[in-house]
UniProtKB/Swiss-Prot annotation:
Main location class: cytoplasm
Name of the coding gene: pepT
Protein name according to UniProt: Peptidase T
Protein's UniProt keywords contain Plastid: no
Catalytic activity: Release of the N-terminal residue from a tripeptide
Amino acid sequence: MNNLLDRFLNYVSFDTQSKPGVRQVPSTEGQFRLARALQSELLALGLEQVTLSEHGCVMATLPANVAWPVPTIGFIAHMDTAPDASGKNVNPQIVENYRGGDIALGIGDEILSPVMFPVLHQLLGQTLITTDGKTLLGADDKSGIAEIMTAMVRLKQGNTPHGEIRVAFTPDEEVGKGAQHFDVAAFGAEWAYTVDGGGVGELECENFNAASVNIKIIGNNVHPGSAKGVMVNALGLANRIHALLPAAEVPEQTDGYEGFYHLVSMKGSVEKAEMHYIVRDFSREGFEARKKHMMAIAKQVGQGLHPDCYIEVTLDDSYYNMRDEVAKHPHIVALARQAMCDLAIEPIERPIRGGTDGAQLSFHGLPCPNLFTGGYNFHGKHEFITLEGMEKAVSVIMRIAELTAGRARVAG
């Protein structure tokens, strides 16, 4: 298992799907199994200070190979896969020298089509790794783990000058808890990069402000034949709440810097209903306004209800936009930008329409922009990645390490 592809295929064989609503971290045992495997691999590769925390966070050090002082930098990826689709029994397909057109995913009716995913037109001649149409792939973010691990091996075995490098592999990023038990002081890096982005060239230093909104609705059920003035239909109230939200401000109709309200689930009966939303916005003002709007709608719909019937709203902030924190350290993004340009990769700087561990870590003293992995269509059965994109991610990691050492020598 010495090359990039072998590593990636090994990592996706672990079922590490995280589970929302679980207090313990990691939320699933499968993540611990991968963490222990990564710990063993790091030790076998000869990295130092290899640790595995009680919460499943793996850390290790690649010592410097230069004599002059160099800032310690870090690279971080997460082990879990999204709850949105199964990560069990992942069966990757390797499509060499992609010639265009539809790709059959397994033996069913699922296909990966350039009609639905036009980015495929840009990937002719490349090696694609896809799903078999039954699960997600796990490129988010096991490709990041494979890329970091491969970069460390090549740096250790090669002649590229570099300072001390810390690596970390975290649990439960997909359920917003990846950085909750991350020991920034123990990690000991001056800055870091998550390797958790998408297509080649992506360089991200701003992300959504995010919150989850849970709405509990208690109604009153009686026989529908004698319900007038007595029945309170909890599902009807839920429908009214959703109808009062802006219909166009949903994920499927927004992009760029536009925020949204997303109804993730709704279940219930006449007697009781529950709704779960996520709320996203790039500006803090817009974020707070969205949360207030949801509270106001719930209050409006709940007016005049019988005292035994009510609407209860619970708001929980998940993470905030790291833009202002990263902006305090412009050299970090400049370094990544330069690394890409040196490798003839055009940096694509755009906001993350999501979050990363780096978003939370940036607020805990570890500024942490996000680098591409080379993957696409995360969180579903159409997820895929290119081997060429993964190799470019490895090269960027190595070039950042080299540039950091070079600039430190000049400054010294």
